[in-house]
Design a protein with these regions (language model features):
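Serine-hydrolase catalytic core recognition
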Residues: 493-538
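Short loop/turn segments that connect beta-strands within beta-propeller blades
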Residues: 214-217, 253-257, 318-322, 369-373, ...
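Blade-terminus and WD-like Trp-Asp/Gly-His loop motifs, strongest in beta-propeller folds
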Residues: 128, 184-192, 228-237, 271-279, ...
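A flexible loop/linker signature enriched in serine peptidases of the S9 family
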Residues: 178, 197-209, 240-250, 263-269, ...
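Accessory carbohydrate-binding/adhesion or oligomerization-edge regions at the termini
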Residues: 20-75, 133-172
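Blade-loop segments of beta-propeller domains
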Residues: 217-247, 264-270
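A short beta-strand motif characteristic of beta-propeller blades
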Residues: 170-176, 217-223, 258-263, 323-328, ...
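Aromatic-lined ligand-binding clefts that engage carbohydrates, nucleic acids, or primary amines
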Residues: 95, 99-112, 134
């Protein structure tokens, strides 16, 4: 009795090993697409091969042709009255787990199979979790017809869902590839906005594009691959270009399209245009001492980082004369934080190392008067500030930093407990008497981007609110903070004009990628302007 049972088990195992067949009974059809035989100038090609009719299958057919298919469920493949024609039959395979299958196409004489747009060699399918598009391209001849039967063999057919249509799963490819928003910036007069997009293709290659749109109408008025930014006044944008005569700076008026040459032969270094558009502040690099090839030398731990020994200094480039003069000199780097609205003062920061105690890096803020070339200290040797900007009248400075910054004036924890160094808060410092006013001492969320609005004298900022980046408005006159309701969970970037009541911002939600909006700062209502991945996710 044991032998028959063992034999039956072996038979069952062989059946399971062979897998089960899933017939594809409904297909999407597009065609026919007539193709012609090429003109024969020679009997063989450069590889001494004669022409083969099957090579017509290598004719490129755009995937866009599959957008309006017909439903086909017959046993005989559609033909054509043309001598030769190409036809496309397609279906989808959806699998939520990794799966393997064998694709069988019977009856057709000349055909190729494409999986997600790539030609399949052989008939073995290795399917990652996704909705896959299978396309059979076949060649028909006049007066001849082929039968057609398509099926899948799989050991786990329950993992495969065969169908037609355009609906598909959201997969990792949708996260890694496609178009995203990098930044947005509204013009000083509030009429236009520049939005930077980056598009990532399969394989990792990417490209940037900059679109200028009309804020009121919402339509795109210009597009370029040049990295463009707004001039400090009006609605002109600028960009640089390298020529035989050096690096040149152009400005373009969005409304008229007029392009003006602002400067020629400017240094090939980072720069900031002054608010009155009369000069550039150049950040120049001074190379540090080189390490001896015979000695492996590390001055301090950070010396292991490339470029640590280099220093950054500031210089002023006069756009009228083309003369560049140094603004700062010294052993430690100096960086630009802001320029006053009247272009007469610079807010700069410098840092130095102190490895003997915490914090190990100390930062100082200074106001430089460009007329007298004198400096006024605002903050000295603080290890916890991270950024600073002038107020519009340049009498005060808005500083961001942890609760330990500025002698702990923003600290609200019990004695003996150390605040988080990444808990960013905001402070106002009077330049004359250096009096510090903490603005967000009792505000819990960690502040991210912040902008002082010259239009209504409010501070708009984003903050890390639990698992969201929320948008807020702070009234510096009374300290009131209002959370602005927006339709996205993560507000990734904001921009405000010098005049007007429109804010440009972009963000994403739990179920969608980046979207671009404009917000009325009086009504606090947001209007959707662009959803760059909407078509991709259809």
């Amino acid at each position: 009795m044991k032998r028959p049972i063992i034999g039956m088990l072996a038979l069952c195992s062989s059946v399971i090993a062979m897998g089960e067949t899933v017939d594809v009974k409904t297909l999407e059809y597009t065609g026919p697409y007539p193709v012609q035989m090429p003109l024969m100038f020679d009997s063989v090609d450069v590889n001494s091969r004669k022409f083969d009719v099957k090579s017509l299958l290598d004719t490129h057919v755009s995937q866009a042709t599959l957008r309006n298919p017909e439903i086909f469920s017959g046993d005989v493949a559609p033909g054509s009255d043309d001598a030769y024609a190409l036809h496309l039959l397609g279906f989808t395979v959806e699998n939520r787990h990794y799966a393997k299958a064998s694709l069988n196409v019977k009856g057709l004489k000349n055909y190729n199979v494409y999986v997600d747009g790539r030609k399949l060699e052989g008939n073995q399918l290795v399917l990652t979790p996704a909705t896959h598009k299978i396309t059979v391209m076949y060649l028909s001849e006049k007066g001849k017809s082929d039968s057609i039967k398509v099926s899948l063999d799989s050991e786990h057919p329950e993992l495969l869902k065969v169908g037609t249509g355009t609906s598909r799963m959201y997969t990792l490819d949708d996260v890694l590839h496609g178009t995203r928003i990098s930044s947005t910036s509204i013009s000083p007069d509030g009429k236009y906005m520049i939005t930077s997009y980056y598009h990532t293709r399969k394989g990792g290659a990417y490209e940037y594009v900059y679109r200028i749109s009309d804020v009121a109408a919402g339509n795109v008025v210009a597009e370029t691959s040049d990295a463009i930014k707004w001039m400090p006044k009006g609605s002109r944008y600028y960009y640089t270009r390298n020529t035989n005569d050096g690096r040149v700076l152009y400005a373009v008026d969005v409304a008229t399209g007029r392009r003006d040459l602002i400067a020629s032969d400017i240094p090939n270094e980072w720069f900031t245009i002054s608010p009155d558009e009369s000069y550039l502040i150049i950040t120049s690099v001074q190379s540090g001492p080189k390490e001896s090839p015979d000695v492996y030398e590390i001055i301090q731990p950070e010396d292991r980082q490339p470029g640590w020994r280099d220093r950054y200094m500031l210089a002023k480039y006069d756009l009228a004369t083309g003369v560049q003069q140094p603004i700062t000199f010294g052993h430690n780097s100096v960086s630009l934080s802001d320029i006053s609205d009247d272009s007469k003062k610079l807010l700069v920061r410098t840092s130095r190392s102190r490895l003997t105690s915490r914090p190990t890096t100390l930062t100082s803020l200074y106001v430089i008067d460009l007329a007298t070339m004198t400096s006024t200290p605002v903050v000295e040797d603080d290890g916890f500030i991270s950024g600073a900007m002038f107020l519009p009248d340049a009498t005060k400075v808005l500083v961001s930093g942890s609760p330990e910054s500025l002698d702990g004036v923003g600290r609200n924890l019990p004695e003996g407990r150390t605040p988080s160094m990444v808990d960013e808060q905001l402070y106002l410092i009077n330049i004359v008497d250096r009096k510090v006013t903490p603005l967000t001492k009792e505000f819990d969320p960690n502040i991210q981007q912040h902008v002082w609005s010259r239009a209504d004298n409010m501070i708009y900022f984003t903050a890390e609110n639990r698992d969201m980046y929320s948008l807020y408005r702070l009234n510096p006159a009374n300290g009131d903070i209002t959370m602005i309701p927006v339709p996205e969970d993560l507000v990734k970037g904001i921009s405000l004009p010098d005049a007007g009541r429109t804010m440009a911002w972009f963000g994403q939600g739990a179920s969608n990628s980046d979207r671009l909006y404009k917000l009325d700062t009086k009504t606090l209502k947001s209007t959707l302007l662009d959803d760059p991945v909407k078509e991709q996710l259809k």
